[in-house]
Amino acid sequence: MKRLHGFVFAALTAVLAPVQAAEDSPASSAAATVAPLHAPKAARKKKAPPAHDPAAFRYVNIAGFGEVAVYKPAGESRGLALFASGDGGWNLGVLDMAHEAVGLGYWVAGFATPQFLKALDAAEGECSDADGWIAKLSDAIVRAFGLPIDTKPIVIGYSSGATVVYAVLAEDAGHTLGGGVSLGFCPDLLIKKPFCPGRGGLTQQKQQVAPFGYVFDKRETVQAPWRILQGEADQVCDPKFAPAFVEGQADAKAVMLPKVGHGFGVPKNWMPQYRDSVREVLEAKH
């Protein structure tokens, strides 16, 4: 099994800020080097990764989510995708995934899953209303950027974000969310308190060994279209969970990827299937 991860909205604000220019990410260095015969030159400092994605349209600060990267499609808008990152936050691999969704016509609002889970744990109540927070994030983006008020967002997530996608879809039971796509899915999160059942009766089990997170039960209450892209070479999330969790759902499919590990490091091995999955969810909700 993979890593265990780690509302009432007291306040929800959106402050528009310009996208900051950033340097390109550095190329990876060689794994090993031969010791030089002469004294080595002073080590060259590596460039820091970009603080912001230059492709983002705006960054907004939203209570409970922190800084959210917002992307605007070039042509006519076809919907809104709320994108939950993996444990690493909003950077690196998830950016390509977000850019692809934008290319299909979505507005995309990308947020750091660790920040989101931390805020849920810190909120009042015995359980976390994750579905409700996601709905309020959608409302904030819709109002800030003038999207149609009846926008029904989809949710996309990678790694721990993929788990969030399942949980909120199962909680929501098809009421406010239009569908979802999970990349690298397994059913556990490092959280301190459980998610609320929601309309769909979501349940989970407390881990009895460290680090004492929660493992979500399979609930056949995902009423919106759901796609899981699962690497067959994934050594973090057991690939068996993907087909098991989609079975019995209203419109769900596990797309197994033979040459893909948990890192989704080679886009040619998964990007076409990801594109097709996002397109399927888009078309199913129209």
Predicted regions and their residues:
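Acidic beta-to-alpha connecting loop that harbors the catalytic carboxylate
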Residues: A84, E232-D234, K259-G261
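Catalytic active-site module of serine/aspartate enzymes centered on a nucleophile-bearing elbow/loop
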Residues: N269-H286
